[in-house]
């Protein structure tokens, strides 16, 4: 048995979904262990192009069991909508290949309202939320003010619990934000429309995972976002509200005894960021727009233009350490093929001193990038399938990043399709 975690090294949007889709050929189970509908894992295969938000990226592989673990922000409305979308494209989803932990907490209708209302209140001080209710959800979870998925099987207790939560939440909605209150009729409609649809998929996934582990099954843990958005290790407060690191995978999946054998850290060949907060190596103007256009850098969930810049060695090295990555997948190398000279942020200039260490979040606003330039290769590399197929300049770019971040780059993605990959 071998267990693997696929995690983001930077701000998210690195290409984790395409790597999960590729590597699930060797795994029996795929588990999403944190985050919620704010994710956007893009997968392109023979069935089309998919932007997965809650569903694990292993759903396209026959024989793979996909699990939403207890650490996930389980949004029944978004999940059921997403399930319908992928099933309409010929993807089979049954309780045999998709299982939802009965210990996952439900993202309730007012969580999205609270998210949007708080961003409106913050105005120009906003965090850049996707407005999917993630921060209010996790806040309520740690206050023990949510519903567990398993409670859907206990209707009377569920309605009493919901009524108590509604009374409490309506105080905040009406008194703090001046918004309309919820009614039980609204919540009962939500239960019927969405929760009843996902109910057949809810079970004790902890037992399933323990059995899988005992029987020598290979388990892949799929993370959302990246190291720099981790609640504890990221650029606080411009983080998500969950732990995005591989170390959290056993807890959030429901298999605390799991040993992670390999951690594949996914790094984009340049930097992108959605949302607010410090982004030291950010490009602006025409240079940024050209990179954004060539990489099609728009949020899979929000459609927002992503902030872009050169690969940031300082931030990436920090991300590798936070994830304890054992190997790296470098994605979207092909996007840089238009550049004559390729910029790389190798150090930061902070308080008149050059540093290669990622600083405390409060210091980042004063950091300036130190840029080196590498020769571009100026040719189409999307057909490369072996290391020798890549031009020398591309090889030098990859090996420089590898040396600087201190972790071997095993996979190099040269296109969005499943087979557009170089394995070293």
List each model region and its residues.
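Non-transmembrane, aqueous-exposed alpha-helical and coiled segments at domain scale
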Residues: 1-424
């Amino acid at each position: 048995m071998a267990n693997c975690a696929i995690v983001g090294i930077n701000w998210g949007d690195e290409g984790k979904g395409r790597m999960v889709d590729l590597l699930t050929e060797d795994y029996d189970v795929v588990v999403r262990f944190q985050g919620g509908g704010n994710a956007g894992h893009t997968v392109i295969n023979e069935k089309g192009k998919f932007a997965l938000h809650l569903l694990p990226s292993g759903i396209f592989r026959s024989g793979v069991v996909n699990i939403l673990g207890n650490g996930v922000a389980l949004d029944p409305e978004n999940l059921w909508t997403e399930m319908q979308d992928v099933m309409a494209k010929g993807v089979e989803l049954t309780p045999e290949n998709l299982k939802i932990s009965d210990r996952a907490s439900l993202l309730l209708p007012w969580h999205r309202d609270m998210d949007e209302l708080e961003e409106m209140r913050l105005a120009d001080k906003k965090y850049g939320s996707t407005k999917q209710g993630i921060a209010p959800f996790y806040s309520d979870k740690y206050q023990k003010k949510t519903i567990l998925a398993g409670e859907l099987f206990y209707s009377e207790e569920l309605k009493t619990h919901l009524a108590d939560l509604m009374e409490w939440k309506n105080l905040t909605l009406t008194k703090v934000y001046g918004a309309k209150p919820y009614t039980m009729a609204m919540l009962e409609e939500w239960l019927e429309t969405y929760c009843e649809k996902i109910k057949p998929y809810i079970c004790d996934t902890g037992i399933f995972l323990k059995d899988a582990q005992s029987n020598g099954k290979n388990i892949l843990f799929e993370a959302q976002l990246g190291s720099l958005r981790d609640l504890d290790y990221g650029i606080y407060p411009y983080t998500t509200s969950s732990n995005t690191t591989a170390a959290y995978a056993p807890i959030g999946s429901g298999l605390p005894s799991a040993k992670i054998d390999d951690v594949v850290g996914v790094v984009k060949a340049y930097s992108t960021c959605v949302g607010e907060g410090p982004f030291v190596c950010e490009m602006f103007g025409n240079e940024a727009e050209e990179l954004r256009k060539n990489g099609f850098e728009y949020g899979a969930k929000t459609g927002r233009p992503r902030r872009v810049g050169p690969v940031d060695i300082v931030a990436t090295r920090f991300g590798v350490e936070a994830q304890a990555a054992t190997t790296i997948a470098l994605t979207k190398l092909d996007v840089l093929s238009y550049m004559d000279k390729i910029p790389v942020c190798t150090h930061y200039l902070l308080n008149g001193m050059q540093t290669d260490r990622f600083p405390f979040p409060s210091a980042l606003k004063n950091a300036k990038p130190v840029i080196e330039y590498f020769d571009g290769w100026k040719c189409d590399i999307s057909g490369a399938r072996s290391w020798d197929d890549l031009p020398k300049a591309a090889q030098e770019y990859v090996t420089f990043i590898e040396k600087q971040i201190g972790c071997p780059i095993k996979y190099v993605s040269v296109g969005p399709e499943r087979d557009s990959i170089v394995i070293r």
